[in-house]
Amino acid sequence: MLAAVSLAFAAPVSASGRGDEGDRGNRERPQWITGWGTSQNGASAVQLTNATVRMIARVSIPGDAVRIRLDNTYGAAVTIGSAYVGPRVQAGDVAAGTNRQVHFAGSPSVTIPAGGSVTSDAVQIQVLARQDLAVSLYVPQAKVNASQHSGAVVSSYYTSNDAGNVAATEARTPFVNTTTSMWWLKSIDVRSSSSPGAIVAFGDSITDGTCTTLDAHDRWEDWVSVRLDSTDAPGAPGSGRFNQRGLKAVVNEGIGGNTVTRTSSPPPDSAPGVERLERDVLSHTGVTHVVLFMGTNDIRREASAAQVIDGMRNIIERVKARGLSIIGATIIPRHNRPPAGTNTGWNPAKTAIRNEVNRWIRTEAAFDDVLDFDKVVRDPADPDLINPPLNCGDGIHPSPAGYYLMGQSVDLRLFDDSGRH
């Protein structure tokens, strides 16, 4: 395994011997890459009746067409009567003249069965890297609870019930309600001739973005995306290798409270990593790299080091079986807390388990590389605690400054081209 070191390196020669010319030739052929994604973790408490929702999602790569995937993992069968997608300019407003109708197998409507998933036809639309898209979905049924990702740290919008079908409307005016959950929208694929693939950040609340800033996109993986798209960052697009190979997409598949396995007690309140790997990672298009950043919630729920490690091994083996690279991230410190209700708290024995798992991640695990986030955020005076300026206040999550430093610590060379799913 390689440690994250200097970011300077020489321009490569490809295995074909054609060097960057060959890379550019491959890049110029348009291909579908997942440019945004999220993980569903339950059903919304909001009931929709003859209403329209407008979900806001920031795609991480440019392209000339998109297709949207809608999942209904936790909902009853639902009909989407109409769907539109367009560039968001502010709040819930779509840029004038850009809202495009979405079709599913040629139809403007689609029914998604309980637990089902649908992907739209291609929609011709120019998108930029890190551009916000508004995906509007009309729900004609009554008392519908959406399958959702809660706590998306992004403002989305929906109408009052019985407002009807306003999916084609470009103004925010009818969208009088706000939510920070993501309803039905699972992912957005981008047809790109400049992106070589996608990086999936597979984790818990520290990937999901707890303690980050609403609508600011300041999670650790957001900063990785910014750096990949920056001409200033060493090892980024403007500095040699990456500007020849194109911009990698970064996809956030974090769920607050998520665990690696289901062996902990009390049981996890969302599908653990070993169970959702196919749905939330391997089903995406154009994936080249996976970052596995979990484990703290297993330990909090009384899992042993062996149980966490066995779960990580399972994920590593399955990712590598698809020909993808997998990068491990060390578990950051967690402050002691007494048990309260179903929360089993944290104590020195759990810190010892964390340190044992981290030792395995650093020295024995079959990861292709390691991101040592533990070293980035820990307190120099006490490595079993989060550095006070980097602690958001709960002793569990980084502050925005901590997330920034985590994103800045990532060696972008780790995302060099690899096999693609």
Feature-to-residue mapping (PLM):
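Active-site-proximal beta-strand/loop segments in catalytic clefts of secreted hydrolases
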Residues: D71, Y138, F202-S205, N252-N258, ...
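N-terminal secretory targeting modules
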Residues: A3, V13-F202, T207-D215, G238, ...
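Catalytic His-Asp segment of secreted/periplasmic serine-dependent ester chemistry enzymes
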Residues: T259, P266, I332-H421
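Active-site segments of SGNH/GDSL-like serine hydrolases
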Residues: F293-R300, I315-R354
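Bacterial N-terminal signal peptides
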Residues: M1-A8
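Conserved SGNH/GDSL esterase-like catalytic core that processes O-acyl groups on lipids
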Residues: W36, R54, A83-G92, A167-A168, ...
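Structured segments of extracytoplasmic/periplasmic soluble domains
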Residues: V226-P234, E253, D280, H284, ...
